[in-house]
Amino acid sequence: VLRIPGVFTDNESGLLGLALHPNFNENKLFYIYYTTIIGGEVTNQVVRYRLTDNIELTDRKIILDGIPAGSQHDGGRIAFGQDGYLYIATGDSDNPSLAQDLTSLAGKILRITDDGEIPSDNPYVSNAYVNTNNIKQEIYSYGHRNPQGLAWDSQGNLWSTEHGPIAHDKINKIVKGGNYGWGLEGSSEFIEPYLSSGIETW
């Protein structure tokens, strides 16, 4: 049994996601998403480790930090896409307004390289507007409440499952730069879910 140091647990917080590097058989790298405490503040981060032949953890590297955390809605699913990039589902940390805030990593699906860099074709790559407004370049889509699943179909489309408020769970087809509506009031300028449970839960 591996023990991950520094994991903080509270309600929905804790050790939330695991992904193996696409070349895990050769490089033994894997990634975890977990809640921790840094400088007295609760936060979520993605960390990479290498697994030795003796089942020990080495070469720790923080791939992404500063993901808002709460006792609810921490997201936490991570997976490598067919394009080789790491996708990270984050919850709104029980603060719906953050899902629409492009300066926050909360309530988003993020996309980064295996080293934590920004892919050049992300929707908010570096330019004067992005830099001036402090938009997070890791963002791939936004307006999410608490996405809990990531999967790709045979055509390469990304799908996500998401917890809604009091049921209203949904399945979304994720598109680059898409706004999925959480945190908006009285607006229809967002992408409708592919499927919704309505007042029931699946």
Name each model feature, range by range.
Residues 1-97, 149-164:
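Acidic, Gly/Ser/Thr-rich repeat motifs that build Ca2+-stabilized beta-propeller blades
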Residues 13-15, 23-25, 92-202:
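Beta-propeller domain segments
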